[in-house]
Amino acid sequence: MKQLTILGSTGSIGCSTLDVVRHNPDSFRVIALVAGKNVARMAEQCLEFSPRYAVMDDTSSAEQLKIMLQQHGSRTEVLSGQQAACEMAALDEVGHVMAAIVGAAGLLPTLAAIRAGKTILLANKESLVTCGRLFMDEVKRSNARLLPVDSEHNAIFQSLPQSIQHNLGYADLEQNGVTSILLTGSGGPFRETPMCDLAAMTPDQACRHPNWSMGRKVSVDSATMMNKGLEYIEARWLFNASARQMEVLIHPQSVIHSMVRYQDGSVLAQLGEPDMRTPIAHTMAWPNRVTSGAQPLDFCKLSALTFSAPDYQRYPCLKLAMEAFEQGQAATTALNAANEITVAAFLAQQIRFTDIAGLNLAVLERMDLQEPASVEDVLQVDAIAREVARKQVIRLSR
């Protein structure tokens, strides 16, 4: 039986992870749950899965949770704060850590899991976007293992030869017969919206993804295709891919989750219903397979599968992310931090949808982008970029 810590248990990925556990009670046991401030959902999870530990972001939320659990006779030990989250990621009895805390808050707990030599089920984009080389070096040093949870990276992983799967981030694609990686994305809810109408799009409209069920921040990132830009950066690190070995395609149906092109002309793809429980179950059970709870793909009900190249005028955030990778980790860190602030401002209706990309670019142009040599350096770049972004938002929304 595999023993789990779930970082970000009350979020979308965390809830889906627990659903896979629910479908496979003899295969997985939850040792620790870590979340932000959603006390009600955490209480439900603790009462159902009886973890040994539960960690909340702050002491107030932890106290509320403790009272609720005591009322139900739960023996789960309640803790709070980032240090406790890091300790849960490194518990001796835990072998697998689901890293699903959204944003820079997930960096240190994920790093703690890596340094403890765990198998990390990586759903936190920021880990590689901001700390790609640092994290990949730490993985090698600690003999940890990264298994990508993002549907696209998981699809690529499944389509790659075992020689690359067992040497992620360091294997030479060309030496293993791989020509390129094809990263697919739906194009989001505004793929066919006239360009002149994009400025008027509301947060609710941006969060109506045509295929996937996601949180609001990730939904906006899908609408701008910043999500795909961050995935591009991740893929470069995960698969040791050069720019010429990467292709990005718009695939509106979200049936083919990504592909790998081989030197002999073959293209291997992973297909499935757009349900995050599939890649989650794959990483949890790898190299075996378990039931995920997802519906099987019905080929007879499929319409045409279509593909097109992304329009960078429609999706400037995608281009921005691709260019940031070439500038280095300070640039990708600053871009990610700026984007978190600008998306939050859009969701709060402080700025327009079309302001997001321009503000992100403005932050990059105003930053002194010196390469970080440690996670502490990364966090400093992150903090400075956030402050610059906040000032830009205030200036624009006056």
Swiss-Prot record:
InterPro entries: DXP_reductoisomerase, DXP_reductoisomerase_C, DXP_reductoisomerase_N, DXPR_C, DXPR_C_sf, NAD(P)-bd_dom_sf. Pfam families: DXP_redisom_C (PF08436), DXP_reductoisom (PF02670), DXPR_C (PF13288). It comes from Salmonella choleraesuis (strain SC-B67). This is 1-deoxy-D-xylulose 5-phosphate reductoisomerase. Mn(2+) binds at D150, E152, E231. It catalyses: 2-C-methyl-D-erythritol 4-phosphate + NADP(+) = 1-deoxy-D-xylulose 5-phosphate + NADPH + H(+). Pathway: Isoprenoid biosynthesis; isopentenyl diphosphate biosynthesis via DXP pathway; isopentenyl diphosphate from 1-deoxy-D-xylulose 5-phosphate: step 1/6. NADPH binds at T10, G11, S12, I13, G36, K37, N38, N124, E126, G215.
